């Protein structure tokens, strides 16, 4: 510290501090000063006279003020940027400037004066001073602009009065008067009671801390040899920027700012600045003892800047003369930002370099005291208002972003306006209650209940009412499906449609065209009538021809007389040939009756048919002499005798195969399609017969007679020929209706084809054995009939068994009618001869296979 260094006795070159005197620190000096030593030159400030009574204070120099800059500054500068000199020299400015500035917060400031020891051998004392600077409100700006001439007159009067005072007062009194003038604000503030009661707690705390410390100061010119060097006498004084502040482009233009409640003390080239508000920057200047050393005060929108310049004739001006005070309480980041902004603004604006000399007057104290008292009272009211304002909680409502494309998106703008209205302060209480309700976690106390059963019951009742109003209620229940389209019940009138749908659901066998097709896509409610096939057309044509023939026969029978005499004559004529040839009709009846004895009792229905045929053919004389074997129920395409055993065996076989097929369809419909057991119909049987997929054929013996080309008879002959070629057994059994019933069909069936008889082999083999026996009997019957027709019967012929009697009778009966046999009979004879050999071979193979199976079973 400076107190520990050796003291120099030079009264002129150094300033000595008495060690016996303790420094006096004012109560409200909101600054704790700490000096740091360096190699740079240190000049004792003018404020040292305040603390030490024997310190000489140099006379005050001239100050340059810029009131016109303050009045005619930037039009947008805030009202709080007001010069501190207005409060310093109230007599130099109009009265309205101070009156308008009473409602602004005060800024306490310490004044420091630079002095040179060699000019003043004695010491003088001074009091610490504080000042309250109140920047004018917004109204003051207009007043400053209105009266610039009055300000100039006041400045000229101040200059003249100051010059007269300087000439009358000795050199020793000048620094005291200057210092008292510069520190008049602080002195008046100490005298006023309002200042002691101001609510500045931070300044009180700083003042107490400063009063407890007792620093000792000692400065010597020998410690600063740069001041004594002659080369520095003509060099201008340069400034060193403060260590805490930013370095601007012009180091001399450093604004000194502070926040409210945070006093800041800075020492920059003889200027001590303390500010309590960021908006008002107050600078107080104490010029050096040299009359050629001047300080300039320039105003900017951000504050005032004080410059210190040294003229060329000043011999005591040194290079890098700077005195600094290290602050224990540093400024905040906001102060640093304000300083940097102000320095940059000043350096870039050359319009504020104009100078005007303002000389202080001794009348400043009296006028300033009254003004400052008014300022303090107004300040108290202002601070009370400012303190009372934050007690009210202000709700800031953030406006939503405005949508520029309101025309393109009208919905967004409307939604934002609604949200903005909803967030008004009036609804703030409602929003709080809603938030509390949300935080409670209970969204709704009443749970949502859905009764699907009740909904379905209501729907069912409604549909029943609709059906009752429109149509008769159906016996079937209404079916509903949850989550899908409801399936409505069908009426009785749609039974046919249901039957078609059931047929549609049956699978289709791709290998069998007779299988029901799977219907896809749209269907007609009334299906379109199928076109009849060529076979069906032929059958229908013959039916019409037969009907017409019957109509003609009925018409002819009506023309014939129905007298009894004619009947007697016709009966006598019929008896005479019977008496002449007693073996004729009687033997035919015996032959017909004897055939069941050979074939079996099952052929009795066939015998009855044969008996009916001659009766039907009685009107024809020629037909009576020709024995009738075939009839409508036993057609001429049959090559075997009919028997009940064969019919029973065929019925059992077909039922078993149908059962197997249905069981397979229930297990696996796809597999049942590919592995069918049976096929029905003339076309399907012929198709699969040509494909060599059938193993057996069952034909009904009572098919309709159609002798035209391409008719039913030709189709049957084609099927039989194919079966003979492929050595496939074909059986004539049952009639069309019985064959349909054995297949569980409601329609008559003419022919059935068997794909596979697996599982019913025993029944199949038995059927084949019975069929071979019936075919053999049919052959013997035809041979006997030929013999009877070929030779004449003799009366001496011994009685023969029933099998032999019909043969000569038939041969005798057929001899006269050999030339009248139809063509198909000759074809059948050839087929029988060819088939007889194959049938014998088949019988031998069947006997061998049965014997082998018996051996295996044993």
Curated annotation (Swiss-Prot):
Broad class of where this protein is predominantly found: cytoplasm
Chain location of the short sequence motif Nuclear localization signal per the record: 380-387
Alphabetical list of InterPro entries matching this protein: Ribosomal_eL30-like_sf, Ribosomal_eL8/eL30/eS12/Gad45, SECISBP2
Composition skew (Pro residues), residue ranges: 795-805
Region (RNA-binding): 678-699
Biased composition regions of type Basic residues, renumbered to the chain: 418-429
Region (Disordered), start-end ranges: 127-261, 275-296, 327-625, 785-819
Swiss-Prot/TrEMBL GO biological process terms: forebrain neuron development; mRNA stabilization; negative regulation of nuclear-transcribed mRNA catabolic process, nonsense-mediated decay; RNA catabolic process; selenocysteine incorporation; striatum development; translation
Bias (Basic and acidic residues) ranges: 147-166, 188-197, 215-224, 539-548
Domain of life: Eukaryota
One MF term in the entry's GO annotations: ribonucleoprotein complex binding
Cellular component annotations (GO), alphabetically ordered: mitochondrion; nucleoplasm; ribonucleoprotein complex
Record localization: Cytoplasm; Nucleus
Biased amino acid composition, Polar residues: 281-296, 327-352, 430-447, 554-563, 571-582
Phenotype of null mutants: Embryonic lethality: embryos implant but die before gastrulation. Conditional deletion in hepatocytes significantly reduces the abundance of many, but not all, selenoprotein mRNAs. Conditional deletion in neurons leads striatal neuronal loss leading to coordination defects: defects are caused by reduced cerebral expression of selenoproteins.
Swiss-Prot/TrEMBL keywords: Cytoplasm, Nucleus, Protein biosynthesis, RNA-binding
Functional summary from the UniProt entry: mRNA-binding protein that binds to the SECIS (selenocysteine insertion sequence) element present in the 3'-UTR of mRNAs encoding selenoproteins and facilitates the incorporation of the rare amino acid selenocysteine. Insertion of selenocysteine at UGA codons is mediated by SECISBP2 and EEFSEC: SECISBP2 (1) specifically binds the SECIS sequence once the 80S ribosome encounters an in-frame UGA codon and (2) contacts the RPS27A/eS31 of the 40S ribosome before ribosome stalling.
Protein known as: Selenocysteine insertion sequence-binding protein 2
Organism: Mus musculus (Mouse)
Gene of this entry: Secisbp2
């Amino acid at each position: 510290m400076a107190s520990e260094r050796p003291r120099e006795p030079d009264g002129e070159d150094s300033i000595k501090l008495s060690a016996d005197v303790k420094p006096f620190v004012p109560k409200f000096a909101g600054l704790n000063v700490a000096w740091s030593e360096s190699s740079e030159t240190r000049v004792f400030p003018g404020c040292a006279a305040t603390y030490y009574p024997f310190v000489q204070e140099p006379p005050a120099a001239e100050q340059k003020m810029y009131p016109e800059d303050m009045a005619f500054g930037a039009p947008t500068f805030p009202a709080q940027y007001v010069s501190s000199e207005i409060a310093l020299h109230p007599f130099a400015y109009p009265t309205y400037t101070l009156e308008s500035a009473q409602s602004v917060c005060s800024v306490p400031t310490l004044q420091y004066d630079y002095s040179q020891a060699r000019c003043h051998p004695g010491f003088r004392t001074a009091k610490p001073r504080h000042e309250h600077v109140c920047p004018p409100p917004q109204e003051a700006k207009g007043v400053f602009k209105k009266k610039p001439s009055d300000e100039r007159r006041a400045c000229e009067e101040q200059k003249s009065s100051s010059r007269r005072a300087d000439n009358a007062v000795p050199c020793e009194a000048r620094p005291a008067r200057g210092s008292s003038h510069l520190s008049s604000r602080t002195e008046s503030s100490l005298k006023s009671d309002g200042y002691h009661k101001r609510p500045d707690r931070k300044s009180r705390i700083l003042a107490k801390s400063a009063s407890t410390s007792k620093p000792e100061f000692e400065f010597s010119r020998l410690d600063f040899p740069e001041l004594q060097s002659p080369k520095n006498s003509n060099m201008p004084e340069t400034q060193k920027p403060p260590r805490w502040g930013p370095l601007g482009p012009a180091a001399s233009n450093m604004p000194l700012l502070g926040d409210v409640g945070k006093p800041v003390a800075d020492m920059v080239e003889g200027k001590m600045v303390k500010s309590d508000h960021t908006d008002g920057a107050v600078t107080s200047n104490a010029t050096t003892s040299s009359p050629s050393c001047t300080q300039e005060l320039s105003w900017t929108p951000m504050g005032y800047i004080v410059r210190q310049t040294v003229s060329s004739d000043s011999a005591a001006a040194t290079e890098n003369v700077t005195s600094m005070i290290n602050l224990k309480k540093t400024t905040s980041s906001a102060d640093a930002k304000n300083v940097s902004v102000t320095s940059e603004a000043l350096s870039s604006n050359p319009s504020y370099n104009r100078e005007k000399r303002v000389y202080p007057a001794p009348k400043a104290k009296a006028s300033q005291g009254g003004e400052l008292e008014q300022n303090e009272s107004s300040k108290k009211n202002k601070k009370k208002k400012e303190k009372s304002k934050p007690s009210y909680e202000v709700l800031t409502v953030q406006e939503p972003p405005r949508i520029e494309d309101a025309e393109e998106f009208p919905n967004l703008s409307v939604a934002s306006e609604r949200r903005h209205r909803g967030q008004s302060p009036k609804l703030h209480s409602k929003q709080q209650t809603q938030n509390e309700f949300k935080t409670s976690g209970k969204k709704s106390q009443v749970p949502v209940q859905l009764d699907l059963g009740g909904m379905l019951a209501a729907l069912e009742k409604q549909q029943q009412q609709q059906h009752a109003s429109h149509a008769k209620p159906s016996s079937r229940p209404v079916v509903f499906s949850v989550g899908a389209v409801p399936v409505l019940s069908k009426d009785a009138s749609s039974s046919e449609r249901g039957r078609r749908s059931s047929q549609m659901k049956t699978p289709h066998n791709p290998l069998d065209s007779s299988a029901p097709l799977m219907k896809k896509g749209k269907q007609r409610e009334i299906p379109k009538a199928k076109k009849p096939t060529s076979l069906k057309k032929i059958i229908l044509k013959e039916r019409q021809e037969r009907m017409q023939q019957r109509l003609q026969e009925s018409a002819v029978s009506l023309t014939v007389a129905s007298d009894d005499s004619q009947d007697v004559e016709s009966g006598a004529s019929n008896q005479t040939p019977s008496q002449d040839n007693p073996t004729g009709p009687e033997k035919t009846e015996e032959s017909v009756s004897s055939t069941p004895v050979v074939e079996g009792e099952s052929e009795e229905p066939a015998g009855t048919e044969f008996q009916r045929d001659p009766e039907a053919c009685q009107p024809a004389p020629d037909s009576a002499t020709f024995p009738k074997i075939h009839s409508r129920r036993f057609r001429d395409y049959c090559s075997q005798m009919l028997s009940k055993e064969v019919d029973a065996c065929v019925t059992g076989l077909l039922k078993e195969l149908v059962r197997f097929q249905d069981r397979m369809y229930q297990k696996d419909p796809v597999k049942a399609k590919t592995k069918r057991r049976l096929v029905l119909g003339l076309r399907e049987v012929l198709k699969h017969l040509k494909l060599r997929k059938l193993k057996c054929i069952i034909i009904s013996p009572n098919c309709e007679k159609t002798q035209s080309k391409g008719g039913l008879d030709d189709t049957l002959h084609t099927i039989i020929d194919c079966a003979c070629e492929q050595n496939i057994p074909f059986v004539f059994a049952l009639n069309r209706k019985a064959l349909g019933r054995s297949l569980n069909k409601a329609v008559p069936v003419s022919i059935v084809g068997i794909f596979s008889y697996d599982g019913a082999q025993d029944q199949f083999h038995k059927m084949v054995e019975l069929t071979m026996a019936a075919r053999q009997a049919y052959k013997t019957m035809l041979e006997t009939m030929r013999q009877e027709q070929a030779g004449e019967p003799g009366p001496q012929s011994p009685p023969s068994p029933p099998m032999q009697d019909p043969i000569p009778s038939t041969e005798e009966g057929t001899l006269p009618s050999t030339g009248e046999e139809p063509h198909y009979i000759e074809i059948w004879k050839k087929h029988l001869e060819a088939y007889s050999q194959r049938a014998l071979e088949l019988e031998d193979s069947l006997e061998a296979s049965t014997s082998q199976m018996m051996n295996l079973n044993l």
